[in-house]
Amino acid sequence: MVKVIASSVRKGNVLDVDGKLYVVLTAQNFHPGKGTPVTQVDMRRIVDGVKVSERWRTTEQVERAFVEDVSFQFLYEDGEGFHFMNPSSYDQVVVDVDTMGDDKAYLQEGMSCILSMHEGIALALQLPRHVTLEIMETEPVVKGQTASSSYKPAILSNGVRAMVPPHINAGTRVVIATEDNSYVERAKD
C-alpha cells in the first residue's frame, strides 16, 4: 500500500479504505471560495460491487493499493463476460460486466487496453485516450445558426451520443475522447 494525497486520486485507481478495496469511478477536486479544497470520489467496492461516495480534504492521505497495470488485447464478448488476452504470455482473462462499467461501449475487437490487476483479478479497465468511430446519425445544420461556435448532437457507431461540430455529417469517421465522449477531430484515414 502506498499513501498518496487525495487530490492525486484518479479514475481507475484502487484504494484501500478501512481494509476494503475500492475502484475509483470518478474523482473531482473542488476549490470553494471559502473553506478548504476537497476531493469528491465515487468508488465501487470490489468484493460486492456496492457504490460509495467519499469526500476528503485534498491534502488528506489515502492508501492506494498495489495494482499492476498489464497490457491486454480485447478479443470478444459473450455471456461469460469480456475476454482479453495478454499478448506476451497469451493468457486469457474474463472480465465481468460490472467491472467494465460504461467503458464497454468503446471496446473494439483487437483493441489494446490496460487492465489493472490485483492478485490475478481484473479490477479496472483503461481504454486508449482516443478512438475512431463513425457518425451514424446527426441533425442537419440550419443556415444562419453558425454565427457562434455551436455543436450538434450525433449518435456514434457504438450507440454513444456525442456533440460534434456543424460540418460533420452522418457517415464521417471522427476521433472521440473516451474519457468524456468529446469530439477531438475528423479521422485522418
UniProtKB/Swiss-Prot annotation:
Record's subcellular location: Cytoplasm
Any one cellular-component term (Gene Ontology): cytoplasm
GO BP terms: peptide biosynthetic process
PANTHER family linked: ELONGATION FACTOR P, TRANSLATION ELONGATION FACTOR KOW-LIKE DOMAIN-CONTAINING PROTEIN
Principal location listed in the UniProt entry: cytoplasm
GO MF entry, a single one: translation elongation factor activity
Function summary: Involved in peptide bond synthesis. Stimulates efficient translation and peptide-bond synthesis on native or reconstituted 70S ribosomes in vitro. Probably functions indirectly by altering the affinity of the ribosome for aminoacyl-tRNA, thus increasing their reactivity as acceptors for peptidyl transferase.
Superkingdom of origin organism: Bacteria
Keyword entries, A-Z: Cytoplasm, Elongation factor, Protein biosynthesis
Presence of the UniProt keyword Zinc in the record: no
Biochemical pathway: Protein biosynthesis; polypeptide chain elongation
Keyword Cytoplasm belongs to the record: yes
Family stated for the protein in its record: Belongs to the elongation factor P family.
Name of the protein in question: Elongation factor P
Protein species of origin: Rhizobium johnstonii (strain DSM 114642 / LMG 32736 / 3841)
